[in-house]
C-alpha cells in the first residue's frame, strides 16, 4: 500500500517540500537559517496575535495599553518581549541568510533571489510599522522622520506624505493605519515565503562548492530535519536568554517616554537592524539623494546575478573575493555603529567613507576580483 503522504493531495505537497525533498548532501549549517526564519515568522505571528488582543491603536491609549500588557496581562511581559526581541532574531537570521546567499552564489537562482529581495523589503516595512505602535518618543519621531523622506519625491512628495499620514502630521489616523498594515503584512510575508520556496524547489538548493549536486542528493527527512531542529533549539536558547536576562538591551530608552510632538529627542534613530541603511541615508547631504541611496542599499542585491563575472559560483575557492566579502561585512558593522551615533565630526566622514566603500565593493571590486581570479586560473 502506498504511503498516505505520497497520495493525499495536501500531504503530497508537504512531503515534496519537507520530507522526500532531494537535498545536497554537503550543505552546511549556514543553510539552517531559512528554516529558522520560518520559525521566527510563526513566533512573531503567534505573539503578535496575542498582543493585538490587548493593544489599542489610539494615540491616547496606545502607550498605556502596552504598559497594561506588561503589568496586568498574564505573562504579557513575556509575550511583548518575545515579540520585540523576536524581531531582532528575525533580522539576525535574515542578514545571515542573505549573507550566505552572497557568499555561496545562491543569487544565480534569479527568481528565488528576487523573491527574497521582495520579502526583505516587506519584512523591513512590517518591522518599521511595528516600531511605531508602542507610541513612545522614538516611535513617534521615527515615524515622522522616515515617512517624511517621501516628501523628497518631486512634485507629488508632500501630497503623498500627507496622504500616508492621513492628516498634516503623524497622528491618530497614522497609528490606526500602521496597526492595520502591521497586522496584515506578516500574512503577506507567509504567502511570499511560499512563493520563495516554490521557486527554490524548481531548481533545488545550492551547496557550498557551488557545483551541480544532482548526482549526490539525500532526503531532507531525517537528515536535515534533525539538523534544523538543533538550529531551532539554539535560536530558542539565544532568544530566551535575551528576553529573560536583558529584554531592553536592543531597545531605545526614549521609547519608555510617551510620544510628545512638542519635544524632539536629541538623537532620532531606528531599531538597530535599520542602522546600516540609516547611516547610508544620512551620509548624503541631499534629501532625494539620501532616499535613493537608502533604497539602493537593498536594491543593489538585485544586481548581483548580473555582476557575477567568475566562472565559479561560490566564493569557497576564491580567496580574493573572500577577502572583499569579509571587508564588506566589516563595513556593514561600521555603518551599523555610525547609524547610532550623532551627526557630527568624525562620524559624518566615517559614514560617508563606509557608504562609498559599501557600493564600491559590490559594484566594482567584486566583479573585478572575479575576472582577476579567472585570469589567474587560466595562467596556472
From Swiss-Prot:
Compartment(s) where it occurs, according to its Swiss-Prot or TrEMBL record: Mitochondrion inner membrane
GO MF term set: metal ion binding; ubiquinol-cytochrome-c reductase activity
UniProt keyword terms in alphabetical order: Electron transport, Heme, Iron, Membrane, Metal-binding, Mitochondrion, Mitochondrion inner membrane, Respiratory chain, Transmembrane, Transmembrane helix, Transport, Ubiquinone
Annotated binding of a ubiquinone, by residue: 201
Lipid bilayer topology: Multi-pass membrane protein
Outcome after substituting residue 193 to V: In strain: Isolate Egran655
Residues reported in the UniProt entry to bind heme b b566: 97, 196
Note on how the cofactor is bound: Binds 2 heme b groups non-covalently.
Entry cofactors: heme b
Lineage: superkingdom: Eukaryota
GO CC entries: mitochondrial inner membrane; respiratory chain complex III
Effect of residue 189 to I: In strain: Isolate Egran655
Transmembrane intervals: 33-53, 77-98, 113-133, 178-198, 226-246, 288-308, 320-340, 347-367
GO BP term, pick one: mitochondrial electron transport, ubiquinol to cytochrome c
InterPro entries: Cyt_b/b6_C (IPR005798), Cyt_b/b6_C_sf (IPR036150), Cyt_b/b6_N (IPR005797), Cytb/b6-like_sf (IPR027387), Cytochrome_b (IPR030689), Cytochrome_b_C_euk/bac (IPR048260), Cytochrome_b_N_euk/bac (IPR048259), Di-haem_cyt_TM (IPR016174)
Positions bound to heme b b562: 83, 182
Other comment: Heme 1 (or BL or b562) is low-potential and absorbs at about 562 nm, and heme 2 (or BH or b566) is high-potential and absorbs at about 566 nm.
UniProt family annotation: Belongs to the cytochrome b family.
Main function: Component of the ubiquinol-cytochrome c reductase complex (complex III or cytochrome b-c1 complex) that is part of the mitochondrial respiratory chain. The b-c1 complex mediates electron transfer from ubiquinol to cytochrome c. Contributes to the generation of a proton gradient across the mitochondrial membrane that is then used for ATP synthesis.
Protein name per UniProt: Cytochrome b
Organism of derivation: Eliurus grandidieri (Grandidier's tufted-tailed rat)
Amino acid at each position: 500500500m502506498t504511503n498516505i503522504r505520497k497520495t493525499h493531495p495536501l500531504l503530497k505537497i508537504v512531503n515534496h517540500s519537507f520530507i522526500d525533498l532531494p537535498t545536497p548532501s554537503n550543505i552546511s549549517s549556514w543553510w539552517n537559517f531559512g528554516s529558522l526564519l520560518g520559525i521566527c515568522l510563526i513566533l512573531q505571528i503567534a505573539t503578535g496575535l496575542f498582543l493585538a488582543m490587548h493593544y489599542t491603536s489610539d494615540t491616547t491609549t496606545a502607550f498605556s495599553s502596552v504598559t497594561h500588557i506588561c503589568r496586568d496581562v498574564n505573562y504579557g511581559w513575556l509575550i511583548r518581549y518575545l515579540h520585540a526581541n523576536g524581531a531582532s532574531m528575525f533580522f539576525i537570521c535574515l542578514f545571515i541568510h542573505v549573507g550566505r546567499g552572497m557568499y555561496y552564489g545562491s543569487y544565480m537562482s534569479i527568481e528565488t533571489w528576487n523573491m527574497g529581495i521582495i520579502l526583505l523589503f516587506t519584512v523591513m516595512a512590517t518591522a518599521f510599522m511595528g516600531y511605531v505602535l508602542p507610541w513612545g518618543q522614538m516611535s513617534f519621531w521615527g515615524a515622522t522622520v522616515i515617512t517624511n523622506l517621501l516628501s523628497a519625491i518631486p512634485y507629488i512628495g508632500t501630497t503623498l506624505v500627507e496622504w500616508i499620514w492621513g492628516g498634516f502630521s503623524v497622528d491618530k489616523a497614522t497609528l490606526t493605519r500602521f496597526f492595520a498594515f502591521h497586522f496584515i503584512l506578516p500574512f503577506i510575508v507567509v504567502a511570499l515565503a511560499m512563493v520563495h520556496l516554490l521557486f527554490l524547489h524548481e531548481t533545488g538548493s545550492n551547496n557550498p562548492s557551488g557545483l551541480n549536486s544532482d548526482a549526490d542528493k539525500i532526503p531532507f527527512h531525517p537528515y536535515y530535519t534533525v539538523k534544523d531542529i538543533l538550529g531551532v533549539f539554539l535560536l530558542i536558547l539565544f532568544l530566551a536568554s535575551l528576553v529573560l536576562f536583558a529584554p531592553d538591551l536592543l531597545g531605545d530608552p526614549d521609547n519608555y517616554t510617551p510620544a510628545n510632538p512638542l519635544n524632539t529627542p536629541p538623537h532620532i534613530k531606528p531599531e538597530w537592524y535599520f542602522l546600516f541603511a540609516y547611516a547610508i541615508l544620512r551620509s548624503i547631504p541631499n534629501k532625494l539623494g539620501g532616499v535613493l541611496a537608502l533604497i539602493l542599499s537593498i536594491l543593489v542585491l538585485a544586481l548581483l546575478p548580473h555582476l557575477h563575472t567568475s566562472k565559479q559560483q561560490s566564493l569557497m575557492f576564491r580567496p580574493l573575493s573572500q577577502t572583499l566579502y569579509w571587508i564588506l561585512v566589516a563595513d556593514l558593522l561600521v555603518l551599523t555603529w555610525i547609524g547610532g551615533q550623532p551627526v557630527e565630526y568624525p562620524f559624518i566622514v566615517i559614514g560617508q567613507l563606509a557608504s562609498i566603500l559599501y557600493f564600491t565593493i559590490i559594484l566594482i571590486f567584486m566583479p573585478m576580483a572575479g575576472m582577476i581570479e579567472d585570469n589567474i586560473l587560466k595562467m596556472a
